[in-house]
Curated annotation (Swiss-Prot):
GO cellular component, one term: other organism cell membrane
Domain of life, per lineage: Eukaryota
Role of this protein: Shows more potent growth inhibitory activity against the Gram-positive bacteria S.aureus (MIC=50 uM) than against the Gram-negative bacteria E.coli (MIC=150 uM). Has a weak hemolytic activity against human erythrocytes (LC(50)=135 uM).
GO biological process: defense response to bacterium; innate immune response
Chief site of localization: secreted
Organism: Alytes obstetricans
Annotated family: Belongs to the frog skin active peptide (FSAP) family. Alyteserin-2 subfamily.
Expression (tissue specificity): Expressed by the skin glands.
Name of the protein in its database record: Alyteserin-2b
Positions of post-translational Leucine amide modification: L17
Localization in the cell: Secreted; Target cell membrane
């Protein structure tokens, strides 16, 4: 399931940057 959460977290971090 982590594989589905990592991309979401990466997207949030990229959005904040």
């Amino acid at each position: 399931i982590l594989g589905a959460i990592l991309p979401l977290v990466s997207g949030l971090l990229s959005n904040k940057l």
